[in-house]
Amino acid sequence: MDVRQSIHSDHAKTLDTAGLRREFLIETIFVADEYTMTYSHIDRIIVGGVMPVNRTVSVGSEVGKQLGVSYFLERRELGVINIGGPGLITVDGTRYEMNSRDGLYVGKGAKEVVFESADAANPARFYYNCAPAHTTFPTKRVTPADVSPVHLGEDVTSNRRTINKYFIPDVLETCQLSMGLTELAPGNLWNTMPCHTHERRMEVYFYFGLEENSCVFHMMGQPQETRHIVVQNEQAVISPSWSIHSGVGTRAYTFIWGMVGENQVFDDMDHVAVKDLR
């Protein structure tokens, strides 16, 4: 488990490139036949990926001491979105088929969660966010047909995109976790511009669908103290509440956003005008 401490905005603005990447960038999400796990002190989110190829993969009791529990989801809820080939997730004996772009919400208290791929030649790639939970909501699969799509932006500003809201109150109940998938239209490069912050939630962006020799310049920092991190395919960036989170790619891409915090009101954000950025 990779543990990331919280960081004050005054400290963050003094960091060089290596320091910013060390504090906020998660470089490796998928490892064959393993799970990855990054624990952030910011709202206690856990971020990672599971890529079963030749065997099933599950999170066992090895995380118990670090999380202070007997099993992974004893006091946590889990959101998963598959960005790879067909797979299966078994939750306490119940099997859920997971095609590409399918999501699965797993409620607090699930004792055994097992991940597997249907085809080793085209393995599933399960990206997940995990947050503390105070009660149990039912485990539920969410398909692309179930999500609440919102179309934003336009070609002239290079930000035409579709926001697919997977785990939000309109789709299913969770304690605090919200997740969704945003896909840029071909030829569009910007996400979340004009940008915003949200004081009551943190957020993680996971970028994927980037072709070789492509990247995203992820913008972060306070609106008047912006910085950037160069992000490659299948990497994630942790965004504290005080930070903007936006990006521009060398070509179109897709990203999964995940938020945890004190509310789930999607529009509870503080907008920042482009003219006010520094």
From Swiss-Prot:
The keyword Isomerase applies. It is an enzyme of class 5 (isomerase). One of its GO terms (biological process) is pectin catabolic process. It holds the Pfam family KduI. Gene3D superfamilies: Jelly Rolls, pectin degrading enzyme 5-keto 4- deoxyuronate isomerase, domain 1. Catalyzes the isomerization of 5-dehydro-4-deoxy-D-glucuronate to 3-deoxy-D-glycero-2,5-hexodiulosonate. Belongs to the KduI family. It catalyses: 5-dehydro-4-deoxy-D-glucuronate = 3-deoxy-D-glycero-2,5-hexodiulosonate. GO terms for molecular function: 4-deoxy-L-threo-5-hexosulose-uronate ketol-isomerase activity; zinc ion binding. The gene is kduI. This is 4-deoxy-L-threo-5-hexosulose-uronate ketol-isomerase. Its EC number is 5.3.1.17. The keyword Aminoacyl-tRNA synthetase does not apply. Its cofactor is Zn(2+). PANTHER family: 4-DEOXY-L-THREO-5-HEXOSULOSE-URONATE KETOL-ISOMERASE (PTHR38461:SF1). Zn(2+) binds at residues 196, 198, 203, 245. Transmembrane segments: none annotated. It comes from the Bacteria. Pathway: Glycan metabolism; pectin degradation; 2-dehydro-3-deoxy-D-gluconate from pectin: step 4/5.
